[in-house]
């Protein structure tokens, strides 16, 4: 069907595995929420984005106060029942709050060992899932009505693409439905292209197009065929340029465009450029725990182990200050610190920080067992077999997440001897 010989299934699997990382980055980019810049009321955007109420709600969001942001966005939606973008902001906040609870907001998982090939099962409460689906459908329906009434409504096209993009991110990260999500991502791009045709200065619309341009250019033809986007073109540098334009001139997508830009530069190992973008975000929002964590992650990725260790420790130090961060998921910082110390051959320190990650009260079972497995490996390298066995037993215990069980059982039989 695809012109591949029967004995080439193994190379094909390798191609798909390599490209899963790129797909994961596509949806990771859809996760960065919007924050309106200070702009002039004549900006090419829905007027609601320039109101103090929306700005205040985003302030709470960017301090990772999801409950405070949700309360405010719900009030905005109630006061503006015909605003699709207001509905989209409620959708965004619900999705982010849930992904935070699931430890799915550390982009290291998207840029490296892809969650798409993991065995992890993510459980979402039915009421939460139902509300996310309802909000998505409501936002799209509102846009459909507005486009029918006015085919030149750029705001409606943009808001529809925004809702589709958010939903695509959700079903990818939670359900691993990346084929369906890729099609939604393409629909989001189409909506953005239409918004730009109507208003060439609608800078926010360039973000979805830029993401698709880069991601599609990174995929070989076989994978495009498999996910049904064979007619879509892509160009990496054009995609990056579009993201830069949205970051510079967008009202709604300036922050998420920078986040996407940083992720894609990271994907292509352009670490100094990625770190420069991410450091700008961390400086602009020093109380955003995720931006600070990502700055440390990128420092690690560019090969500056000592610098990354110092960056992770600064995050932990700030987290000890009263009210500096809101509900920081410190397990992600401890895990990143341990990984970096492991790479620097600081084995005892790595073991301790894997244990710290596992001990965090809000750590998901999935991340806890990953930390326990890694702690066991460190104890084996330290020739502390009894401690290693204890960690492997916890990582392979019945019930809960089983994604680390096979490796843990293997090391129960034979001590880990790698690095």
State where each predicted segment sits:
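Alpha-helical adaptor scaffolds
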Residues: 254-266, 299-306, 313-367
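Boundary/linker segments of alpha-helical solenoid repeat arrays
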Residues: 82-86, 155, 203-204, 252-256, ...
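Bacterial N-terminal signal peptides
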Residues: 21-34
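Amphipathic alpha-helical segments of tetratricopeptide repeats
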Residues: 78, 190, 197, 247-248, ...
């Amino acid at each position: 069907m695809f012109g591949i010989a029967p004995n080439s299934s193994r190379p094909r699997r390798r191609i798909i595995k390599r490209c899963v990382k790129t797909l994961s980055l596509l949806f990771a980019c859809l996760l960065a929420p919007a924050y309106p810049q200070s702009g002039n009321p004549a900006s090419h955007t829905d007027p609601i984005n320039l109101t103090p109420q929306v700005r205040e709600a985003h302030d709470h969001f960017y301090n990772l106060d999801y409950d405070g942001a949700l309360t405010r966005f719900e009030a905005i939606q109630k006061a503006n029942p015909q605003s699709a973008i207001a509905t989209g902001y409620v959708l965004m906040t619900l999705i982010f709050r849930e992904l935070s609870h699931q430890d799915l907001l550390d982009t290291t998982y998207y840029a490296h060992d892809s969650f798409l090939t993991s065995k992890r099962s993510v459980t979402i409460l039915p009421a939460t899932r139902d509300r996310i689906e309802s909000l998505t459908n409501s936002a799209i329906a509102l846009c459909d009505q507005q486009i029918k009434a006015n085919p030149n409504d750029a705001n409606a096209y943009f808001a529809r693409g925004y809702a589709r993009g958010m939903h695509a991110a959700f079903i990818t990260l939670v359900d691993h439905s990346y084929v369906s999500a890729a099609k939604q991502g393409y629909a989001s791009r189409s909506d953005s292209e239409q918004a730009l045709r109507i208003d060439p200065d609608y800078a926010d619309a360039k973000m979805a197009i830029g993401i698709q341009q880069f991601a599609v250019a990174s995929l070989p033809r076989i994978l495009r065929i498999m996910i049904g986007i064979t007619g879509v073109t892509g160009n990496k540098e054009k995609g990056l340029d579009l993201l830069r334009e949205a970051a510079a001139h967008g009202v709604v997508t300036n922050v998420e465009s920078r986040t996407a830009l940083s992720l894609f530069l990271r994907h292509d190992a352009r670490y100094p450029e990625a770190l420069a973008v991410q450091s700008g975000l961390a400086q602009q929002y020093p109380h955003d725990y995720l931006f600070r964590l990502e700055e440390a992650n990128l420092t690690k990725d560019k090969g500056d182990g000592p610098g990354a260790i110092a960056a992770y420790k600064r995050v932990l130090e700030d987290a000890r200050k009263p009210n500096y961060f809101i509900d920081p998921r410190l397990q992600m910082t401890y895990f990143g610190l341990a990984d970096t110390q492991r790479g620097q051959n600081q084995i005892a320190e790595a073991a301790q920080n894997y244990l710290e990650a596992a001990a965090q009260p809000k750590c998901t079972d999935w991340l806890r067992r990953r930390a326990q497995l890694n702690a066991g490996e460190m104890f084996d390298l330290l020739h502390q077999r009894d401690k290693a066995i204890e960690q492997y037993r916890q990582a392979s215990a019945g019930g809960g997440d089983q994604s680390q069980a096979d490796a843990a059982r293997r090391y129960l039989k034979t001590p880990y001897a790698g690095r």
